[in-house]
């Protein structure tokens, strides 16, 4: 056969009634070998092997009309049914006439199998339908070479020959005949070549030799594993899982792959993941529950009971669910257990006196400065005179009474024995010193506290002070037992500032005590602010 010859090999069931099995036709050009008879050559209106084709690469009915005329005039004989060399058939020529209906049926069947990739529900009796090799595998183009086309045809015949009706390979790939299966007859194409443009350039014979014509994939409906039938080693094909079976078809286009393996893969993967998750998550929930219960149980103030409950929950694997009322009780206990030691640790007591009972933040009044001094009786750092600051009007009366008694005592025991001078200095000493010496102290209760301090401290040193004050400010005559002038002297002293007050030694001591009180007040305010934050 010359290089310009083109041939078309067609396989399919029911190609003729004379042979009783699959037949094939050979179409040749003007130089193709023919049987006995005249060789009229190509007709003017007859299309060549590449002419008259549609977009799909298949000849149209008009082209086949002309080809039928060529065959009737002495065209090629059928493969497999022609006479062997030396037989009488070679001499007489065996011509088969194909009707237009049979050619159209063949073309429709081949187009359905090759282009659309229809999946068929096949029974063991109709397995030959899936083994039909498409026409496009060996279809020739106008510029193709005869040798390349012949190689393609031989490869197609060699691979399609073993697969025959009634002889399914190895039986394993077809599964149980009684079981309904899905058979996908898919074509494996190279990854870089699409099926539509595979044979656009048929000059290279490597493409034809590398192409495997067919792969039959059967996916059982009952959820079994997919079995692949390879044309090379059908009996040695191992059983693959759905995922591996999918990986063994890397070159099949997405349109050719059936949806059955994807569904099976998704279902099996989902079931496998669920099974693994069930196996792996049998123990973690128990552990998580025990950990959560341990954390929740560590909040109450009884760690032993919480630890026992946590170990019991971990051993049994059941998470006890406390009622809302029990949760509230536990929260209250946890708040109480945390706040009591925290106060003792965070704010240690100062001074010598330590209270045994913990401080309650709710009992602290808002900061006003002076009311906080009322709690200073529990601490030794606060002077003893400040204890009287929390008393009401009765405390003030007692302070005034002490001042009057001190004035009377100094008047009786004075060196001068002059009752006219003594009451006035004593009243001035007891009542007037806090006003100039404490300019920033409130004029309420602190003044009474300082009065009591002055009265207690001046009782031993009343004689020299009384003498000095007596010499500076003499007063008019008055009865020694009369104590009324002591009540009016603070008002008079506010108007008349006595001289030499800046050089008094007692002012330094009083100022020092005032500074100490201010420091204590600041510390108390700081602590009260912290308690309020907590």
Curated annotation (Swiss-Prot):
Cite a single Pfam family from the UniProt record.
DUF4641
**Compositional bias per record (Basic and acidic residues), positions renumbered to this chain:** 230-239
Which of UniProt's keywords are assigned here? Phosphoprotein
Spell out which residues are annotated as carrying Phosphoserine.
87, 123
Keyword flag Cytoplasm:
no
Record flagged with keyword Cytoplasm? no
Signal peptide span? none
InterPro entries per UniProt: DUF4641
- Locate the compositionally biased regions of type Low complexity: 145-161
Biased composition (Pro residues) is annotated at 35-45
Q: What residue spans carry the region label Disordered?
A: 1-93, 123-260, 313-349, 383-505
Q: Which PANTHER family match?
A: GENE 4779-RELATED
The protein's name in its UniProt record: Uncharacterized protein CXorf49 homolog
């Amino acid at each position: 056969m010359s290089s310009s010859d083109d041939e078309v090999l067609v396989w399919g069931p029911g190609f003729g009634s004379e042979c009783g099995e699959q037949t094939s036709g050979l179409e040749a050009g003007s130089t193709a070998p023919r049987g006995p008879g005249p060789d009229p050559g190509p007709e003017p209106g007859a299309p060549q092997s590449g002419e008259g084709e549609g977009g799909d690469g298949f000849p149209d009915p008009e082209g086949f009309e002309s080809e039928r005329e060529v065959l009737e005039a002495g065209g090629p004989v059928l493969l497999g049914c022609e006479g062997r060399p030396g037989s009488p058939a070679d001499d007489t020529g065996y011509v088969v006439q194909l009707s237009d209906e049979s050619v159209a049926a063949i073309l429709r069947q081949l187009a359905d199998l090759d282009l659309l990739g229809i999946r068929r529900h096949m029974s063991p009796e109709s397995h030959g339908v899936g083994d039909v090799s498409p026409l496009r595998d060996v279809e020739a183009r106008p510029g193709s070479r005869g040798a390349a086309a012949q190689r393609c045809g031989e490869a197609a015949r060699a691979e399609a020959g073993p697969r025959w009706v009634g002889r399914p390979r190895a039986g394993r790939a077809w599964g149980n005949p009684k079981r309904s299966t899905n058979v996908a007859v898919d074509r494996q194409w190279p990854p870089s070549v699409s099926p539509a443009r595979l044979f656009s350039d048929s000059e290279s014979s490597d493409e034809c030799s590398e192409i495997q014509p067919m792969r039959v994939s059967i996916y059982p409906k009952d959820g079994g594993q997919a079995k692949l039938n390879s044309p090379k080693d059908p009996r040695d094909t191992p059983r693959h899982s759905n995922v591996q079976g999918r990986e063994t078809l890397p070159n099949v286009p997405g349109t050719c792959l059936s949806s059955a393996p994807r569904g099976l893969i998704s279902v099996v993967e989902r079931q496998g993941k669920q099974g693994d998750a069930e196996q792996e998550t049998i123990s973690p929930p128990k552990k998580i529950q025990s950990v959560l219960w341990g954390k929740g149980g560590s909040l109450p103030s009884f760690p032993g009971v919480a630890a026992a409950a946590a170990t019991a929950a971990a051993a049994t694997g059941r998470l006890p669910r406390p009622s809302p009322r029990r949760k509230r009780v536990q929260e209250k206990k946890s708040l109480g257990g945390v706040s009591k030691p925290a106060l003792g640790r965070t704010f240690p007591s100062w001074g010598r006196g330590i209270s045994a009972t913990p401080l309650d933040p709710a009992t602290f009044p808002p900061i006003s400065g002076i009311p906080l001094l009322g709690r200073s009786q529990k601490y030794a750092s606060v002077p003893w005179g400040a204890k009287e600051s929390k008393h009401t009007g009765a405390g003030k009366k007692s302070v005034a009474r002490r001042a009057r008694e001190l004035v009377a005592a100094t008047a009786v025991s004075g060196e001068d024995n002059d009752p006219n001078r003594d009451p006035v200095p004593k009243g001035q000493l007891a009542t007037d010193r806090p006003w100039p010496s404490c300019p920033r102290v409130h004029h309420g209760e602190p003044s009474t506290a300082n009065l009591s301090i002055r009265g207690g401290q001046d009782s031993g040193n009343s004689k020299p002070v009384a003498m000095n004050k007596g010499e500076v400010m003499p007063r008019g005559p008055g009865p020694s037992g009369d104590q009324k002038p002591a009540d009016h002297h603070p008002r008079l002293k506010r108007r008349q500032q006595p001289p030499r007050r800046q050089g008094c030694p007692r002012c330094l001591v009083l100022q020092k005590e005032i500074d100490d009180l201010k420091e204590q007040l600041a510390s108390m305010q700081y602590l009260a602010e912290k308690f309020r934050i907590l």
